[in-house]
Design a protein with these regions (language model features):
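Acidic Gly/Asp/Thr-rich repetitive segments characteristic of extracellular carbohydrate-active
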Residues: 117-157, 162
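Short glycine/acidic-rich loop motifs that flank beta-strands on beta-rich extracellular proteins
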Residues: 1-2, 24-31, 55-62, 79-86, ...
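Extracellular beta-strand solenoid repeats
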Residues: 15, 45, 149, 156, ...
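Surface beta-loop-beta hairpin patches that serve as ligand-binding interfaces in beta-rich domains
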Residues: 77-126
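Acidic glycine-/aspartate-rich tracts in secreted/extracellular proteins
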Residues: 153-154, 173-176, 388
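Right-handed parallel beta-helix
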Residues: 1, 12-23, 42-53, 68-78, ...
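Right-handed parallel beta-helix/beta-spiral solenoid domain characteristic of secreted/periplasmic
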Residues: 131, 165-223, 237, 242-244
């Protein structure tokens, strides 16, 4: 009621009839009610429909008042007999659904050509690298799907390792992590993921300590600006240390980039002035965000001035469903105790789980977990310990 221009109006004068729903688990009426959208649907009819689902006890979910919806002559076949005004249980012959795939070349607009090239991954190609080798050149020449194996030692890099294809970078020996250190003349990332990039990185140490006469690394792992394609990132068993500039982060997603999934597990973040994990670059508050599905588990955060985890999805636009955030089995020690700081800043995740985490002397100047959730968001925080 009294909606602002271009906002929501009440649902009225809608007819839904002669539809067949087979194994549909979410038939809902009144979805989306909040303090702005207060009027339930009116003059709506749901007539002569068929609902078949052996896994449900009732045909629909009433999220709000359904008095304005007329149910009539609907047939249902559910897990058990169901009787309600407008619904009868009958044995209904399910429609025969096609089980063959559509022929793609015969579908879609005739003028459309898919211009996105997806390089075939060569999962068998390995590249053994020793200290003194130019990592950027090895990555540039590696085939898609290649595995770059680093021997123990220090690898100074002068510019970002540019990942624009599926690649894996791992240590030859997990117990002796290779150390990557930036010594370029201009600030740059250590690793930059670009269009086409899908990266797995395992058991590598990223050291952001300042080399005399050289520039600082802007990030351990980050993204190119204004990417068109989504990417995936898996970071396992890595260490990020000695990033001494407040605006430079260990792992970061930049504005206008989007990760389908980010997995960070078994990692150590220590002695950082900036954030450890930052996916908070979309500040326009129009429903955009940097990563859709994020898993952070079994990680340790020690002596951080910045935020250990900073994820942001602003605005009230419901056309996007994410992000989905899971944080579990993580430890935070002496992290972000500055005034109004927070250990986790989690703004706008649609589904959030934080469980089995320990917070020791962290977030004392502000909040341990800072949320700004909407009524429809699913938030679970369980089995966490806090000591100060």
């Amino acid at each position: 009621p009294n909606s602002l221009p271009n906002r929501y109006c009440q649902v009225v004068d809608v007819k839904m009839y002669r539809n067949t729903f087979v194994d549909c688990t979410n038939i809902e009426f009144g979805t989306g009610k909040d303090m702005e959208r207060t009027l339930a649907p009116e003059k709506v009819s749901f007539t002569d429909n068929i609902i078949i689902n052996k896994g449900l006890d009732q045909p629909y979910i009433a999220v709000d008042d359904v008095a304005g919806i007329q149910f009539k002559d609907n047939k249902v076949q559910l897990a058990k007999n169901y009787s309600a005004p407008g619904f009868t249980t009958e044995k209904v012959k399910a429609p025969q659904l096609p089980d063959d795939a559509a022929i793609r070349k015969d579908k879609g607009a005739s003028w459309f050509k898919n211009q996105v090239a997806h390089p075939a991954a060569n999962v068998h190609k390995e590249y053994n690298v020793s200290p003194g080798t130019n990592l950027s050149e090895v990555i540039h020449s590696a085939e898609p799907g290649g595995v770059i194996i680093l021997a123990k030692g220090t690898y100074p890099i002068q510019r970002a390792m540019f990942i624009d294809k599926p690649l894996t970078i791992r240590a030859a020996d997990a117990a002796n992590k290779p150390l990557v250190r930036f010594n370029g003349d201009k600030p740059d990332n250590m690793v930059t993921i670009a269009d086409g990039g899908k990266m797995v990185i395992e058991n590598i140490t990223f050291d952001g300590v300042l080399e005399p006469g050289k520039a600082l690394a802007k990030a351990g792992i980050s993204t190119a600006f204004d990417m068109i394609q989504p990417y995936t990132l898996i970071v396992d068993g890595c260490e990020f240390q000695n990033f001494g500039e407040g605006g430079f982060f260990a792992i970061k997603g930049t504005k206008a980039t989007f990760a389908e999934s980010v997995t960070i597990r078994n990692c150590l973040f220590r002695d950082l002035s900036g954030d450890a994990i930052n996916y908070a670059a979309e500040k326009d508050d129009i429903g955009r965000y940097n990563a859709d599905d994020m898993l952070i588990e079994n990680c340790s955060f020690y002596r951080l001035l910045g935020l250990p985890i900073n994820i942001y999805r602003g605005g009230s636009d419901e056309s996007t469903a994410g992000p989905y955030i899971t944080i579990r089995h993580c430890t935070f020690v002496d992290c972000c105790n500055k005034e109004r700081g927070s250990v986790m800043r989690l703004i706008g995740p649609q589904v959030l789980t934080v469980e089995n985490c320990n917070f020791d002397n962290s977030g004392r100047g502000g909040a341990t977990i800072r949320l700004d959730e909407a009524t429809w968001e699913k938030v679970r925080i369980a089995n966490c310990n806090l000591w100060n």
